[in-house]
Regions:
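Transmembrane alpha-helical segments of polytopic membrane transport and secretion proteins
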Residues: 1-21, 242-256
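Periplasmic/extracellular loop-to-transmembrane helix junction in inner-membrane transport proteins
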Residues: 2-10, 32-76
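Transmembrane-helix boundary motif in ABC transporter permease subunits
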Residues: 73-103
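C-terminal transmembrane helix and the adjacent membrane-cytosol boundary/short C-terminal tail
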Residues: 93, 150, 185, 227-256
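Generic hydrophobic transmembrane alpha-helix motif, especially the helices
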Residues: 104-140, 147-148
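Glycine-rich helix-loop "coupling/hinge" segments at transmembrane-helix boundaries
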Residues: 120-121, 196-233, 252-256
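Transmembrane alpha-helices
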Residues: 131, 135, 167-200, 227-228, ...
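Short cytoplasmic-facing helical segments at TM-TM junctions of multi-pass membrane proteins
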Residues: 144-189, 210
Length: 256
């Protein structure tokens, strides 16, 4: 095994399947052999049996739809704010210096602290959940966009200047296109992070939602239902991650 060796597609698929099989086999051994109590690690059978109960008793599909809506809205709003502002901050250092004293410390804000804050500001209705997801996403997306712009190679800027490009042409035809692939990757990362916030977003007054479903299951000590809810979140997260990754490859094929 060489450092950073290239892996063929066929071998990559085999390694992925092997990894899944090993982890699933370990889960089966630990649970079916009762090496770990089922209140800690339910068996795959118990988790599978939880899905019909969640579907009929807790509206699993509707909850998944509500969570997807909330995460998507927070994600889109964060992108609408972070991308233009990040492009400005990455392109013009004075703007970055002006904004940095306020925006940089926000990266260290505990996300859980935003729950009571957004409740005070927006109440406990739907707006609070979307604003919470927006705030939790935008504070991390913004510096990634700034970094994407700053990482565009100066050689391209110097070449454009030498060829007589104006400042607006350099920004519109060099900096922005050059930073878009990294911004696309940042969006993919932040989509995943958004799903990690959904439990907190739906902890208060959410009749439907995967986070609400998991919170209720936790209060009832239904560990199998918690696992089932988590698996649904993981599934949706993986699918949306794949969709963004495919879109990035199609939009920025020239990058590779």
């Amino acid at each position: 095994m060489e450092i950073r060796e290239a892996v063929s597609k066929h071998r990559a698929r085999g390694l992925i399947l092997a990894g899944v099989a090993v982890f699933f086999g370990l889960w089966c051994v630990l649970s079916y052999a009762s090496l770990v109590p089922d209140v800690i690690l339910p068996s795959p059978t118990e988790v599978l049996q939880a899905f019909p109960r969640l579907h009929f008793e807790e509206a699993l599909v509707r909850s998944a739809g509500w969570s997807l809506y909330r995460v998507t809205m927070g994600f889109v709003l964060a992108a609408v704010v972070a991308i233009p502002l990040g492009l400005l901050m990455g392109t013009f250092p004075p703007i970055k210096l002006f904004c940095a004293p306020v925006l940089d410390p926000l990266r260290f804000l505990p996300i859980s602290a935003l729950v009571p804050l957004t409740i005070v500001w927006f109440g406990i209705e739907e707006k609070q959940k979307i604003v919470f997801l927006f705030m939790g996403t935008v504070v991390y997306l913004l510096p990634l966009v700034v970094e994407a712009v700053e990482n565009v190679d100066d050689v391209f800027l110097q070449t454009a200047t030498t060829l007589g490009a104006t400042r607006s042409q350099i920004v519109g035809q060099v900096l922005i296109p050059g930073s878009l692939p990294a911004i696309g990757e940042a969006l993919r990362v932040m989509n995943g992070i958004g799903w990690t916030y959904v439990i907190l977003a739906e902890v208060i007054n959410a009749p439907y939602g995967l986070g609400a479903l998991i919170n209720v299951a936790g209060k009832r000590s239904h560990v199998d239902q918690i696992f089932a809810g988590v698996l649904v979140i993981l599934f949706i997260g993986v699918v949306t991650d794949w969709m963004i990754r495919v879109a990035n490859k199609q939009l920025f094929a020239w990058k590779s």
